[in-house]
Amino acid sequence: MLKNLFRKTKYITVSQKNIENYKRENTPTIPDGMWVKCNKCGEILYQNDLEKNYMACNLCGNHFRIGAKERIKYLFDKDTFKEWDYKVKTENPLSFKGYDEKIENIKEETNLSEAVTTGKGKIADMEVVVCIMDSKFMMGSMGSVVGEKITRAIERAIELRLPVIIFTVSGGARMQEGILSLMQMAKVSSALAKLDEEGLLYICVLTDPTTGGVTASFAMLGDIILAEPDALIGFAGKRVIEQTINEKLPEDFQKSEFLLEHGFIDKIVPRSDLRKVLAKLINMHKNSF
């Protein structure tokens, strides 16, 4: 009797592998990319709803960063956009170590030829020339090919007597190309001066973030300057400026709302209204084309 009292209890043993298999089979699976977290308010958003809302949070209005392909889809009449100069190739003029490999890798990852897509299309049946920068390609940095493609697009707009719209997003000049990158500021600005002499319309749409040499040149030369809500727009970084002037800057400094309040831009336009606003502006100025 005492022997049975202190007998070791027998347990059913389950291997760790069986437990993991059970969890895997009985846990609901959610496909990758179905839900997205808003980086401003923290709301979990259904991807399909987000796309229907032009990639803007339906709770706080935060505008997610989008690429050139998405902008083309949202902006132009269906099947009217024709891309220009996609075969223009980036070189490595300074023989910067690793630059060639980096460019090829980014091309493969993004399926983009460079940090800007240029071409012609129709908005509400009105033809326009457009240049759309893309942050996925080296943070939209401005190298010699970016400057060349934008300049060519402006020159074609002059030949075709069409308005120009440029969507900016950039971290600034591309350091791997040195002075050749910086000279694109003057090159594009010079082409825009010719566009202005011809009396043609130039609209610039500033998106998050627009900084550095792009801000210091063609981003701020538009006849009409629009911006998306809460976009970061500036030349040097906020902390750099604070350390230089030894003063604390306003919390919303370099945001599109701050720039509108101080007269640097003309209007803040939510992405969902952008096509309608651009169509209205082009229609108002079409007699000058």
UniProtKB/Swiss-Prot annotation:
Zn(2+) binds at residues 38, 41, 57, 60. Residues 34-289 form the CoA carboxyltransferase N-terminal domain. It is found in: Cytoplasm. GO terms for cellular component: acetyl-CoA carboxylase complex. It catalyses: N(6)-carboxybiotinyl-L-lysyl-[protein] + acetyl-CoA = N(6)-biotinyl-L-lysyl-[protein] + malonyl-CoA. Pfam families: Carboxyl_trans (PF01039), Zn_ribbon_ACC (PF17848). Keywords: ATP-binding, Cytoplasm, Fatty acid biosynthesis, Fatty acid metabolism, Lipid biosynthesis, Lipid metabolism, Metal-binding, Nucleotide-binding, Transferase, Zinc, Zinc-finger. Its main location: cytoplasm. Its cofactor is Zn(2+). InterPro entries: AcCoA_carboxyl_beta, Acetyl_CoA_COase_Trfase_b_su, ClpP/crotonase-like_dom_sf, COA_CT_N, Znf-ACC. PANTHER family: ACETYL-COENZYME A CARBOXYLASE CARBOXYL TRANSFERASE SUBUNIT BETA, CHLOROPLASTIC. Component of the acetyl coenzyme A carboxylase (ACC) complex. Biotin carboxylase (BC) catalyzes the carboxylation of biotin on its carrier protein (BCCP) and then the CO(2) group is transferred by the transcarboxylase to acetyl-CoA to form malonyl-CoA. Acetyl-CoA carboxylase is a heterohexamer composed of biotin carboxyl carrier protein (AccB), biotin carboxylase (AccC) and two subunits each of ACCase subunit alpha (AccA) and ACCase subunit beta (AccD). This is Acetyl-coenzyme A carboxylase carboxyl transferase subunit beta. It comes from Clostridium botulinum (strain Loch Maree / Type A3).
